[in-house]
Amino acid sequence: MEDKIKSFLDLVRERNGDEPEFMQAVEEVAETVIPYIVNKNIYHGKNILLRMVEPERVISFRVCWVDDSGEIQVNRGYRIQMNSAIGPYKGGLRFHPTVNMSILKFLAFEQVFKNSLTTLPMGGGKGGSDFDPKGKSDNEIMRFCHGFMSELFRHIGPNTDVPAGDIGVGGREIGFLFGKYKKLKNEFTGVLTGKGISWGGSLIRPEATGYGTVYFAQNMLATKKDDFKNKIIVISGSGNVAQYAAEKSIQLGAKVVTMSDSSGYIYDPEGIDSEKLKFIMNLKNIERKRVSEYCVKYPNSIFVKDETPWSIKCDIALPCATQNELNINDAKTLLENGCICVSEGANMPSTKDAVHEFQKAQILFAPGKASNAGGVATSGLEMTQNSLRYNWTRKEVDEKLKDIMMEIHNSCIEYGSDNNGYVDYVKGANIAGFVKVADAMLAQGVV
């Protein structure tokens, strides 16, 4: 079996060159899915996984825009249309200087499995640019977004490819992108998700990824007859996902003690309550300042520069910042400090070695493709509402989100349980996501 996995990975590596993030994502899937394929005659000779790791389409383009000083700037734009076997391509746009082909291919590949797990008819894709929105004026961001959409518009559509937000792309950017698309196409359609409520958005969409991460952890804890009440929670990040993961944790009676950004983390031993969280939301969403400002307002807290929060003692860890933020040493520290549950809010925030450490200890560990699928699930619900020209209530969307996260959890248990009662959620998520897409690809022939 190891030889089969190695030969497959060698072939993918040879085809894709130096793309470490993409290879990390493929390796994780191959380790669990190839043994499953070997035992299922229906997939023999079809090269299904090899077809899944090859994008259906890779789009790269130039984005020119004018900054506030009148100088022309040039960035690169991308869209990876990975797999459309079960629905139109669906996945976010990321604006960040680190964006490259490897990162977007990894995100698009993960998105295929994540979208499959939601039970909704969505394929997988991802896109973005190496543009850095930090320090830019609203007008500069608008001009960049309009330049970006001037090329992207010809490759997307409500039945073809429906982008959304990601790191560096929030409600403001989605608004600029949608406005330009509407102008270019002269039509009002659900071509983007994450829109404002008054122009086609869905209630709960901003909260969905963070809420879903917590709902998934709730489902895992329930298998041990446990819950969030009085648990100590360590959260990384302070963006959208982290904010709403914190909000839902607080609502469930837990004590959130950390949040972070790229400058370091804050630790509040008294706990970040609802009032303090509102301060952080205003700090990050409106004032766009560093999380360290929290310690000026609340002097009983401390700020640790250039570090991640995984050394803080906790019951539950929710990594909600970015890929590979939690390494094997962090995993060992969390385990030594008594952590019983890790639910990934970001995409692939734990390194491969860290994941193996959690699995070896047999704690509750949820991979991002399962636990943070609430965001894209609610994007799917937004697409449904756009098609119906109708809006569900906040309660209706939240209930649907809870149901979807429970279904994802049940699928992970179905494919990830061993004979001793341990649930390998990584294995379960990979196989459950694979089966739906693979069966659709078989049914549609060689295309």
Language-model segments: what does each one mean?
Residues M1-L203, K436-G445:
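N-terminal ligand-binding/catalytic initiation module
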Residues V33, L104-L107, L177, T213-L221, ...:
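Buried hydrophobic packing segments
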Residues E2-A25, M220-L221, L335-V447:
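Adenosine-phosphate binding glycine-rich loop
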Residues D3, G17-Q24, E28, Y43, ...:
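Conserved active-site and cofactor/substrate-binding residues in soluble primary-metabolism enzymes
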Residues G196, G201-S311:
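Glycine-rich phosphate/diphosphate-binding loop of Rossmann-like nucleotide-binding domains
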Residues Y78-R79, P121, G128, T160-D161, ...:
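Structural motif
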Residues F106, T160-A164, E187-L192, I235, ...:
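General beta-strand structural signal in soluble alpha/beta enzymes
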Residues G264-F365, A370:
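Rossmann-like adenosine-cofactor binding region
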